Structure formats: structure tokens, C-alpha cells
Amino acid sequence: MPAPQDPRNLPIRQQMEALIRRKQAEITQGLESIDTVKFHADTWTRGNDGGGGTSMVIQDGTTFEKGGVNVSVVYGQLSPAAVSAMKADHKNLRLPEDPKTGLPVTDGVKFFACGLSMVIHPVNPHAPTTHLNYRYFETWNQDGTPQTWWFGGGADLTPSYLYEEDGQLFHQLHKDALDKHDTALYPRFKKWCDEYFYITHRKETRGIGGIFFDDYDERDPQEILKMVEDCFDAFLPSYLTIVKRRKDMPYTKEEQQWQAIRRGRYVEFNLIYDRGTQFGLRTPGSRVESILMSLPEHASWLYNHHPAPGSREAKLLEVTTKPREWVK
């Protein structure tokens, strides 16, 4: 019987695909352990385009109102329009040239992308929404040689009511994960998160942050893959602990209304600014249901709404309008 192959000898794209499928199972099982309903699997393919994925969806539970943990593995041709939009961040990304004319070809660039994307919206207004996404992307030249590659991702917390100890725990465990690789990473990725999840027209962040990085190719890909795995491993110990603290707390209709207003902000960011949403909707054969899985079941927009000064609602806005440091 031949010896099992060392996973590190496989292409990075295969290692990343195996990682996200394993983490999808771990995360859904962990979240199910504190709810009365189970995730159901929705497997999809891209039709004539390459690849597909599995969306694990939970809805109408006693703990989680709506949530999804989606794995996608897609490949095919990246359109010239998509290449043009992305090449500013990737100098090696370019349209191949026709050897006869020397002009860029019109059928795009071959690509592979895989990732796990998750958003969870709890029932209780005191339990925070969370988002997690880790992904890998690569392109090839027409002859099959690699052209460019990068990782992206992160995890963040979006509470309706601020609990200092929750923010500290979430940030500390993700800092610990990054510190294993370089103590300079957490401050950089924390700042990146605050800047990325910013709702410009509201002049506030979407939540209280976490970590975020994109177009990341500064280290050996094997090292980045291990960093991503360590960040994955920080998620359940932090988020499950927080939700267990909050899921059975009493709440009022007024607190539910504030939760719906804050979820309106979530919708605004995801539909207007989020790069992943925009990329997904531009990709031929992409699945709209999976892309918009992040949207909450209920959201609200009240005209010219402002919380009372000194209220708990106003305290949250102090943090979203001026991001703070959560750990030393």
C-alpha cells in the first residue's frame, strides 16, 4: 500500500479547497450545537461554467435567525472587464496577446477561485452578527503557466449593543492567531478591517471590526495558508463563547427595532461597497442566492433616526464612528 501523500506537496489551490471544506463542516457543527435547528445543504454548479459549491443555510432557529456558510470552488475565464477592474491591484494580471496580431485576446484570462464565506445573524439583539471569509485566487497564462495569485479574507463582528468583553475576546483570539506568524500582522489587518468595512455615506464602520486582508501575496503561499488556517481556528472559540453569553438575554421590542436599523446598515455596505459581492455578481455563472446569502431576514430604515444621547444605542455609535483599539 503506498504511503499517503504529504498534503504540502499538493498545489496550493487543492490544499486551500481541502481546508475550506473541512472548516465548513467544523463551523456548521459548532453553530448547530447552540441552536434548535440544523443547517441544510444546498449544492450548486455553474452550469456551462466551471465549478460550483455548497451553501449550508440555517434559518428560523431559536439562536440564529438566518445564516449561511458557503464554500465555492469556481474556475473558467475571467472577462476582460473583470481583468481591467482588478489589474490595478495586481501588476502581473493582464490579458494574453494574440501571437499573430499582438493585440489582447477577447476571451479573458483563465482563473481559479475558492473560498469560504459566512455571515450569521442571531435572533437576540444582544448577540452580534458575524462575518468570516477566507479565499484564494489564481490566474494562468494561455500556455498554462501561472500568472498571478493571492489570498484574502478576515473575520469581523457587528453588534447592535456593545459589550466590551465580547469585542476584546474576538480581537484577542484573532491577534493571537496572527502573532504566531508576525506580531506586525494584527495591527495592520485590524486597521485594514476598520478601513474596508466603512460606510462612507454614513461616516461610520459596519461594526467593531476584526481582521481583514486582501490581494495578499507577500509571503510564501504555504506560510499564508497556515496563517489562514490559524485564523480559522480562532473563530469558533471566540464567536461561540460570545453567543452563549447573549443568546438567552431578555430583550425589548425597542431593542429589536434598533437591531433592524443596524442591519439596514449591513445591507447598505454589502450591496454598495463590498468587493466580494461586486466580483460575484460580475462573474459569469455565479449564483446570486449564495452571493446575497449575507443579507439579513429583517432590516429597517427609519427616516432621520438618531438614538438618544447617552443611550446604549448611542454608545455603539461612538465606536462605529471612531474605531478603537481592543487589545494591547
Curated annotation (Swiss-Prot):
Pfam families: Coprogen_oxidas (PF01218)
Lineage per the UniProt record: Eukaryota, Fungi, Dikarya, Ascomycota, Saccharomycotina
Organism from which the protein derives: Saccharomyces cerevisiae (strain ATCC 204508 / S288c)
pH dependence per the entry: Optimum pH is 7.6.
Protein name: Oxygen-dependent coproporphyrinogen-III oxidase
Gene Ontology BP terms: heme biosynthetic process; protoporphyrinogen IX biosynthetic process
EC number: 1.3.3.3
Primary localization: cytoplasm
Cellular component, GO annotation: cytoplasm; cytosol
Enzyme class, spelled out: oxidoreductase
Record-marked site positions (Important for dimerization): 201
Chain sites annotated for binding substrate: 117, 133-135, 285-290
Residues the record marks as active site: 131
Misc. comment: Present with 22000 molecules/cell in log phase SD medium.
Family affiliation: Belongs to the aerobic coproporphyrinogen-III oxidase family.
Role: Involved in the heme biosynthesis. Catalyzes the aerobic oxidative decarboxylation of propionate groups of rings A and B of coproporphyrinogen-III to yield the vinyl groups in protoporphyrinogen-IX.
Biological pathway: Porphyrin-containing compound metabolism; protoporphyrin-IX biosynthesis; protoporphyrinogen-IX from coproporphyrinogen-III (O2 route): step 1/1
Subcellular localization: Cytoplasm
Quaternary data: Homodimer.
Reactions that this protein is recorded to catalyse: coproporphyrinogen III + O2 + 2 H(+) = protoporphyrinogen IX + 2 CO2 + 2 H2O
Gene Ontology MF term list: coproporphyrinogen oxidase activity; protein homodimerization activity
Keyword annotations from UniProtKB, A to Z: Cytoplasm, Disulfide bond, Heme biosynthesis, Oxidoreductase, Porphyrin biosynthesis
